């Protein structure tokens, strides 16, 4: 933990990082190839840099200088960061729209035989926050993509249903399905993790699924923050008289019940990879609506004010203990993990994304003459 010597906030958006961590891990550790290009949502920058650190593409010194001069950037930046940032991202959803136009440009260069030798066609990917759907340029890009029949494009929505402005409207997901479907996208909803899917097949399972589907976003977030006893109280009250309810609740202690009720697909690696594999096609753009929890696994999870919140030193100490990371091991790549370090190193060396070295390609410079000659005529028009 870096001290705040002047009392000002130091650190990023921890809750936003937590909601996107599994999605980014699935992308960079499995789904992506070196030729793919990704726009990472700006508030998930620390997760991106951590993945690059694991892959040996980021230094400890720059990580420790996060948000400081010369350190890794709070928003991914192609000009200020030194690692594999494909698109600079920031406010108003510009990174999201850029991926769509990058896909169109790639199609153009291929169609005109202008792709450089040895450069393979890649997929364009954007990991976006649900609040980025408030930005008009995202919808302008959607319409342009429909006009040009864009393909080979993934937009992954980190649907944690919380933003700086408050809790997302209950029915936003239906609108997402409508307007993406209207633009000829394939919409894939990732809502339930494998534990919840298994519970739905057991005692009171159908009633449990209906309760989750009907639970308002603000209540779900509040229960996520309060934990197991709060889940139990609400389920007992709301599902009173449901056959099998006692059997369902009695089979989980408070911690286990909380784990079950927060098992959303956006935090379930198996569910995410299944969806990515099933959508591995180029001819149609793909929209993944991944249900997540803002602050997942943190003491801030679900809290209404967690957008820019930071864990206190005491909370961070408890978090490190929970993750089995001892003092002094914070920068050990495999701290807290029970797997053999050699196996983990071998895995990282075989990650498809990192299979080749340099991912940046420099185009030849276009010569610009010192002076543009013009031929004056008696009559000229400004309209062409």
Feature-to-residue mapping (PLM):
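Conserved internal helical-beta-strand scaffold that buttresses enzyme catalytic cores
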Residues: 1-12, 18, 36, 42-45, ...
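Generic beta-sheet signal
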Residues: 36-38, 122-124, 153, 284-292
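Conserved alpha/beta enzyme-core scaffolds, especially Rossmann-like or related mixed alpha/beta domains
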Residues: 3, 14-17, 118-129, 155-160, ...
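Long, well-ordered, tryptophan-enriched scaffold segments
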Residues: 159-377
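Short internal beta-strands
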Residues: 38-41, 152-160
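Cofactor-binding active-site loop characterized by glycine-rich and histidine/acidic residues
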Residues: 8, 14-148, 169
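Structural signal for hydrophobic packing residues in well-ordered secondary-structure cores
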Residues: 1-3, 27-32, 52-56, 67-70, ...
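Phosphate/oxyanion-binding active-site loops and adjacent basic polyanion-contact surfaces
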Residues: 15-20, 90-98, 134, 261-272, ...
């Amino acid at each position: 933990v870096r001290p705040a010597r002047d009392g000002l906030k130091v650190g990023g958006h921890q809750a936003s990082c937590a909601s996107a961590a599994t999605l980014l891990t699935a992308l960079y550790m499995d789904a992506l190839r070196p030729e793919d290009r990704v726009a990472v949502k700006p508030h998930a920058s620390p997760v991106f840099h951590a993945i690059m650190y694991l892959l040996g593409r980021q230094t400890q010194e720059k990580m420790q200088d996060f948000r400081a001069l010369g350190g890794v950037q709070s928003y991914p930046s192609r000009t200020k960061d030194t690692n594999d940032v494909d698109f600079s991202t920031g406010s108003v959803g510009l990174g999201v729209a850029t991926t769509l136009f990058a896909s169109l440009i790639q199609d153009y260069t291929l169609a005109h035989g202008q792709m450089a030798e040895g450069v393979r066609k890649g997929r364009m990917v954007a990991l976006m926050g649900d609040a980025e759907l408030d930005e008009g340029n995202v919808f302008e890009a959607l319409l342009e993509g429909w006009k040009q029949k864009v393909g080979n494009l993934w937009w992954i929505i980190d649907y944690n249903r919380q933003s700086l402005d408050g809790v997302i409207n209950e029915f936003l997901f239906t609108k997402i399905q409508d307007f993406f479907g209207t633009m000829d996208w394939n919409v894939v909803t990732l809502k339930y993790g494998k534990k919840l899917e298994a519970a739905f097949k057991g005692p009171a399972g159908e009633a449990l699924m209906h309760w989750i589907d009907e639970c308002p976003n603000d209540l779900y977030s509040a229960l996520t923050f309060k934990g197991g006893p709060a889940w139990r109280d609400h389920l007992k009250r709301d599902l009173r008289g449901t056959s099998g309810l006692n059997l369902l609740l009695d089979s989980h202690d408070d911690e286990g019940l909380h784990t079950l009720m927060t098992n959303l697909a956006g935090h379930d690696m198996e569910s995410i990879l299944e969806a990515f594999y099933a959508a591995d096609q180029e001819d149609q753009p793909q929209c993944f609506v991944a249900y997540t929890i803002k602050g997942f696994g943190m003491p801030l999870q679900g809290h209404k004010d967690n957008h820019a919140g930071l864990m206190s030193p005491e909370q961070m100490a408890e978090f490190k203990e929970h993750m089995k990371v001892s003092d002094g091991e914070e920068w050990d790549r495999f701290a807290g993990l029970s797997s053999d370090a050699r196996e983990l190193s071998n895995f990282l060396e075989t990650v498809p994304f990192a299979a080749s070295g340099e991912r940046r390609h420099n185009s030849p410079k276009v010569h610009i003459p010192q002076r543009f000659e013009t031929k004056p005529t008696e009559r000229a028009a400004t309209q062409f």
